[in-house]
Amino acid sequence: MPRIGLLIVTAVLATVVAGCSKESDQSSEKSPDWQRGRAVFLANCVACHNNDPTKDGSIGPAIAGSSKELIESRVLSTSYPANYKPKRPTKVMPQFPFLKEEVPYLAAYLAK
């Protein structure tokens, strides 16, 4: 009987460990552009936006699914594209001109 219990416990633990590592496996399967965009996002955006771009941050809104056009407008000039209705029409976001080359990578990361 003890062997069966040990086998069951081992199987349960293996299942839990496999489930925990699923997210890291998925991110390693992402493109280099996605991974670079994630690094840029974590280094420059999470002070205001949530670590999880699908959720609102302390200051900034959720930004997952944002278009490249919107990201470029907001990051480089803090404006909005024509005919875009903002989630929060604030003037709080600063410009990040040094991220000009990173916009395509941010767009890859934030795409749905």
Where are these regions (language model features)?
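ATP/adenylate-binding site constellation spanning eukaryotic-like Ser/Thr protein kinases
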Residues: 10, 42, 68
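Conserved Rossmann-like nucleotide-binding pocket used by diverse enzymes
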Residues: 16, 41, 94
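Electrostatic cytochrome c docking/interface patches
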Residues: 20-40, 56-59
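Detector for the c-type heme attachment site
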Residues: 23, 49-55, 76, 111-112
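Extracytoplasmic electron-transfer domains, predominantly the class I c-type cytochrome c fold
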Residues: 62-112
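Sequence/structural segment immediately N-terminal to covalent heme-attachment motifs in c-type
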Residues: 30-51, 72-73
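Sec-dependent bacterial lipoprotein signal peptides
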Residues: 1-18
